[in-house]
């Protein structure tokens, strides 16, 4: 693995850990981190799956120098893959009765609190 890729991987894990703590402090229960449904499914990795009450959030974490660039980094193809990952998770662990699911984005930028963008997109579910 090239050095820059390793650094990016390390930064991504750090950003996810920061988001997990932020979510916990705001009353969320973490159900999974880096959830993968398996090879050959066409599903991507969901960075964080969290629950608060009857709401389950599938959260994509982006660490960028500028918050605006973080949203641009989530392509339509990536959204579809994350949605498939969420569907695979819900196939194994169904929503609670009258439960809801949504897709959120958490943005980590230097010297700023994490930004939690709720209901960032809707596909399928």
From Swiss-Prot:
Superkingdom of source: Bacteria
Pfam family, one: UPF0102
Molecular functions (GO terms): nucleic acid binding
InterPro entries: Restrct_endonuc-II-like, tRNA_endonuc-like_dom_sf, UPF0102_YraN-like
PANTHER family: UPF0102 PROTEIN YRAN (PTHR34039:SF1)
Family affiliation: Belongs to the UPF0102 family.
Protein name, entry field: UPF0102 protein Rru_A3692
Organism: Rhodospirillum rubrum (strain ATCC 11170 / ATH 1.1.1 / DSM 467 / LMG 4362 / NCIMB 8255 / S1)
């Amino acid at each position: 693995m090239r050095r820059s890729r390793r650094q990016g991987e390390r930064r991504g894990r750090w950003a996810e850990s920061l988001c997990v703590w932020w979510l916990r402090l705001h009353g969320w229960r973490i159900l999974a981190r880096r959830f993968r449904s398996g090879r050959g499914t066409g599903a991507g990795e969901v960075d964080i799956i969290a629950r608060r009450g009857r709401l389950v959030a599938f959260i994509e974490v982006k660490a960028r120098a500028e918050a605006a660039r973080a949203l641009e980094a989530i392509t339509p193809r990536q959204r579809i893959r994350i949605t498939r990952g969420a569907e695979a998770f819900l196939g194994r662990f169904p929503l609670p009765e009258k439960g809801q699911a949504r897709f959120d984005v958490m943005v980590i930028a230097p010297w700023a609190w994490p930004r939690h963008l709720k209901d960032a997109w809707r596909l399928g579910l």
